[in-house]
Amino acid sequence: MSAFTGAAIAAGKIAIDDSSVLIVVDVQNCFLPGGSLAVKDGDQVIPVINRIAKGFANVVMTQDWHTPGHISFASAHAGKKPFETIDLPYGKQVLWPDHCVQGTDGASISKDISIPQAELIIRKGYHKDVDSYSAFTEADGKTSTGLAAYLKAHDIKRVFVTGLATDFCVAWTAMDARKAGFETYIIEDACRGIDANGSLAKAWADTAKAGVKRIQSSDLAIA
């Protein structure tokens, strides 16, 4: 059950119940200050996520989990630099610095994340020849992680997305959640973006067009 009763719900707040899930996207060392693909102020999402997670009975986490020499790494493409875009068989791909390589400390979820009730970790990006931003579907748009079926089997109706980075893995996760039929929210102050070449503004426009709602943690009825 959720961590509060109906009597505690303030006017205008969004109630969290057993049909709600919090998805915590990629709060991993590589994306935090000092990491190989650090998101500016990425560590600031951690206390916000820890606080709001206390109000959710259902929590799913994701973990970027790349092979060495992954197709999304600039180092895998001769003459290419990080943040350049190339065409791959499944579409356009931003090339990244090597990050979140399987089994490395950089791929570990931050030790400061404290969510003991988290029930599932979805690892993504572990197929060498296709990237995966979304917790639901790989970047080819066809290969499912199984998360949508898992959530539906647990009678989840609403998805709340947090984590790193707003304009890539968070946005893609939110749009795929909406596509799968879930009422979907991005909690803005529990996310941070990379903002490469206008990617953050585009992500907000794309998610709004998809029907994803943009809220703050203060909009939730969590004590």
List the predicted regions and their residue ranges.
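Histidine-anchored nucleotide/phosphate-binding helix
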Residues: 48-52, 170-179
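Short internal beta-strands
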Residues: 60-63, 183-190
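Short, flexible loop segments at boundaries between secondary-structure elements
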Residues: 186-200
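Short acidic-hydrophobic, aromatic-tinged amphipathic segments that line or gate anion-handling sites
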Residues: 213-222
